[in-house]
UniProtKB/Swiss-Prot annotation:
Protein name: Cell division topological specificity factor
A UniProt-annotated Pfam family: MinE
UniProt GO BP: cell division; regulation of division septum assembly
Gene name as annotated: minE
Function: Prevents the cell division inhibition by proteins MinC and MinD at internal division sites while permitting inhibition at polar sites. This ensures cell division at the proper site by restricting the formation of a division septum at the midpoint of the long axis of the cell.
Domain of life per record: Bacteria
Family from the record: Belongs to the MinE family.
InterPro entries: MinE, MinE_sf
Entry keywords, A to Z: Cell cycle, Cell division
Length: 94
């Protein structure tokens, strides 16, 4: 009977997962001493540099701080992850 309630519940554990991810994000930001404003400035700078080479979809652009494990010692460290949709390559002459 209890499984039937779980089946029809709206949550299905997703709010727990979302809360866990938000907590991880808060901890990463806290440990790296990275404010939301700093992350936004970093995003703007990345857009400026990459835009010299490619046309990007700024609406779909996502940059976030997360954690990853280093290969050599498996220690968790902060990581900057960027998902940058490219519309097209720009021709450059230098």
């Amino acid at each position: 009977m209890m499984d039937l309630f779980k089946f029809f519940s709206k949550d299905n554990g997703t709010s727990k997962k979302v809360a866990k991810e938000r907590l991880k994000l808060v901890l990463v930001h806290d440990r790296t001493n990275c404010s939301p404003r700093f992350l936004e400035m970093l995003k703007e700078d990345i857009i400026k540099v990459i835009s010299d080479y490619v046309e990007i979809d700024e609406v779909g652009l996502e940059i976030k701080l997360t954690t990853t494990k280093r290969d050599f010692d498996e220690q968790s460290v902060p990581a900057l992850v960027a998902n940058i949709p490219i519309k097209k390559m720009k021709e450059r002459s230098r």
